[in-house]
A protein has these predicted regions:
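Surface beta-loop-beta hairpin patches that serve as ligand-binding interfaces in beta-rich domains
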Residues: 52-56, 60, 98, 442-458, ...
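Acidic Gly/Asp/Thr-rich repetitive segments characteristic of extracellular carbohydrate-active
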Residues: 54-56, 74-114, 118-119, 511
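Feature marks extracellular polysaccharide-active and adherence modules
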Residues: 108, 133-135, 155, 164, ...
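Right-handed parallel beta-helix/beta-spiral solenoid domain characteristic of secreted/periplasmic
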Residues: 109, 123-174, 222, 464-468
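Surface-exposed loop/turn segments connecting beta-strands in extracellular beta-rich domains
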Residues: 114-115, 140, 170-172, 185, ...
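Predominantly extracellular beta-rich ligand-binding scaffolds that present long acidic/polar faces
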Residues: 115-116, 120-121, 127, 307-312, ...
């Protein structure tokens, strides 16, 4: 029999794709294959499935055109003019010392060995940012050799700067520091790994004012942050005001060395407004997202956490100490309470989130309420919390075979607006409401269904108590809804965001939870060519 050369075998297929998928894009081809695919913008994380890893363009330069005014290369020379690719500079420090407002310094790929910290002291202006960016298609690696404490330090007052497209490695303390009084700084397309913290904003003791002032108007986006010993992206002592964290993957912090209570994925002790959106925060030793833990006066305004996937963090998932809005988040696999809010005086909105299958992994979990709002602390025995809960799914929280499932705790200071939620965690205690008088504070699933909860609280209109019918449960968790889910088309129209956790537009009758169920409106056929290796 004649043998077929598989390395030359090509199959020409027609790939049938539901047109609804085109809004999300398809994954990248496997190395070694020649595949014609539709790909998302490099600034969009995917895929949508819970167990798959999202594709972030960690060190790829921004997709906008880059006009380089200067060049740096590992084999360059700081004595050269740096204005051509054939006569580049050699070091980040020289580039930082020399660049002027409006300059774009392009770094060629390769490893830049640091023997000491690089200090950025020059500022751009409102119309002329100083940009340090990877040369298109290449990845410059800033390497501390395991001995340099910090790699990049934006000195006090350094502002109007962009840093884009770098990998930071082998530092011992912080990969990047913004010391204080830094404003209008853009950090994007970074891959930062290791140290005590990957990126640190402000300097000083935890409970004290910052040594060099706050930082403000900072954007961190389209980056991967991982493997630090303590909190990966850390604003302590703060404040960090007017912050945007967007399309960032944060993982594996606090897993080695001393961990847990100082090892959150994203931790901002003080400051607002803060926007955290479209991030994937997973597998960290402490909390996933922890905001405003030192804003003890409460009433933090402009705090928005939306369209994030917060997965398998060993303590809490999302923690809003002093107020904010949670919208369209997927929260599963935490080791402790999935959501903890309202430690201080707060106004909180929790809208269209899916919070399920938390406290199931016995290797790091401990049993607690799945959602906690207004828990009594020494500072405020019952903090006053104005809380809105609408269109959320709370289901299957805490392993029923290991201590039993758990529900929601609402403290005595909670002023509640609650309707159009689905509860399916603990049949004999879905809600513990300490603010209720005249009866036991624990409400069963049946009491939500039969109107007892509504009679005592005036809340609970259109709540559901049926199994939500996710695509799959533990351990292969996928919290998308099946077509027959009771959550489909049963959300509050007035309160639902315009889109869902994946940016898909919600229809005229929105679903409960973070994911809007959808079906293809048409099918198209795309040619697919595969070469076997």
């Amino acid at each position: 029999m004649q043998k077929t050369n598989l390395s030359r075998l090509r199959s020409h297929l027609m790939l049938m794709i539901p047109i609804g998928l085109l809004a999300c894009g398809l994954g990248s081809p496997v190395p070694g294959d020649e595949t014609v695919v539709l790909t998302p913008s490099p600034l969009v994380a995917g895929p949508a499935t819970e167990t798959g890893e999202p594709q972030f363009p960690a060190t790829a330069a921004a997709t906008t055109a880059v006009t380089c005014t200067h060049y740096v290369a590992p084999n360059g020379d700081d004595k050269d003019p740096g204005t051509t690719t054939t006569q580049p500079w050699a070091t980040f420090q020289h580039a930082a010392d020399t660049a002027q407002p409006g300059d774009t310094v392009c770094f060629r790929g390769g490893t830049y060995a640091f023997t000491e910290e690089a200090y950025l002291t020059q500022s751009g202006t409102a119309g002329a940012t100083i940009t340090f960016i990877a040369y298109p298609g290449e990845t410059p690696v800033l390497d501390g050799g395991g001995s340099v404490g910090e790699l990049l330090i934006l000195d006090q007052y350094t502002s109007y700067v962009r840093i884009s497209g770098f990998a930071l490695r082998n530092f011992t303390i912080w990969g990047m520091e913004l010391s204080g009084e830094n404003r209008y700084v853009q950090l994007d397309h970074l891959d930062v790994a290791g140290g005590e913290a990957s990126i640190h904003f402000t300097v000083g003791e935890t409970e004290a004012p910052p040594d060099y002032g706050p930082v403000e108007h900072i954007t961190l986006e389209d980056s991967t942050i991982h493997g630090s010993e303590y909190s990966a992206v850390d604003c302590t002592p703060g404040p960090c005001n007017h912050m945007v964290i967007r399309r960032v993957e944060i993982y594996d912090t606090g897993i080695v060395g001393e961990s847990f209570y100082g090892s959150d994925g994203l931790e901002f002790a003080r400051g607002y407004p803060v926007l955290v959106e479209d991030c994937y925060v997973h597998d960290n030793g402490g909390d996933g997202i922890d905001l405003n833990s030192r804003d003890r006066q409460g009433n933090a305004t402009g705090v928005v956490v939306r369209r994030n996937r917060v997965v398998r963090n060993h303590l809490n998932g999302i923690k809003l100490w002093a107020g904010g809005r949670m919208e369209n988040n997927i929260v599963w696999g935490q080791g402790n309470s999935a959501v903890w809010v309202g430690t201080f005086t707060s106004t909180l909105e929790i809208i269209n989130n899916t919070i399920a299958y938390n406290m199931w992994d016995t290797t790091y979990s401990e049993r607690n309420w799945a959602v906690v709002a207004g828990y009594p602390e020494e500072i405020l025995p019952y903090p006053p919390v104005t809380l809105t809960l609408v269109n959320n799914i709370f289901a299957f929280n805490a392993d029923p075979t290991d201590g039993g499932s758990t529900g929601m705790y609402l403290g005595g200071g909670v002023q509640l607006t609650e309707h159009h939620n689905l509860y399916y965690s603990r049949a004999d205690g879905e809600i513990t409401a300490e603010f209720v008088s005249g009866r036991d504070p624990d409400f069963t699933r049946a009491e939500i269904a039969d109107g007892t909860w509504t009679n005592f609280t005036g809340q609970g209109q259109n709540d559901l108590t049926d199994a939500p019918l996710f695509v799959s449960g533990w351990p292969g968790v996928n919290l998308h809804l099946q077509e027959s889910s009771p959550a489909v088309d049963n959300g509050s129209i007035a309160d639902a965001p315009a889109d869902d956790a994946e940016g898909r537009v919600r229809d005229a009758q929105p679903d409960i939870g973070a994911y809007e169920w959808w079906e293809p409106v048409a099918w198209i056929y795309v040619p697919l060519t595969i070469r076997s290796s």
